[in-house]
Structures are given as C-alpha cells and as structure tokens.
Amino acid sequence: MAFSAMAAGCADNSVPKAQLPELDLSNPLLAAWNTPHETPPFSEIELADYEPAFDAAIACSRAEIDAIVNNPKKPTFGNTIVALERQGELLNRIAGLFFNLLEADTSDEMQEIA
C-alpha cells in the first residue's frame, strides 16, 4: 500500500502550459492587484469592467482545461484531478468579487450582469 502511494507521488504530474488569450490589462479586474494584501482596487473598477473580465476569465479557464484534456502524457491524479482543481484562478477571483458585491451593494445594473 505504501509503495503504491509512493509510486503515485513519483508520477509525471506536469500539465502543458495553456495557450491563454491576450488579456486587456487596462481592465482593473484583469490586471494584477498591486494593493495591500492584493485587495481589489475598488476605486478603479467600473460596472462596465465586469462583462469583458468575465468573458476573458472564462476563455482563460477553457484554455487551461483544453491543456489538461489534451495532455499527451498518461493521466495521473496530479495532472488531471489536481490540475482541474487549480485551473480557473482568474475566474474565481473575478466571480468572488462580483458576487460578494452583488450581495452587499447591489444595483439594477449589477443585477443585469448577474
């Protein structure tokens, strides 16, 4: 039993790098948050930023999933399950911000986006 666990840990768990779409870094939701504790730059974010950011983040997630699905290496727990769990970081960041604000400080415009 211990041997099989060790063997699984030695498997090649690498995933080819995804070909991510070009991001519009002028959108504050897509750019790095160089703020204390990497908090969102609320003063720079406008409602019009959300839809293009969601579209770009979904495209990134699809590219990351495509890289996992089309990995020529033998599937392992690491290069399949763990990789799927780790993909979508940008989408999670944008959705987390949007849906928290939607609950805390909603507006008709935000409801339309949701």
Model-predicted segments: where are they?
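Bacterial N-terminal signal peptides
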Residues: 1-6
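Zn2+-dependent metallopeptidase catalytic domains
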Residues: 10-114
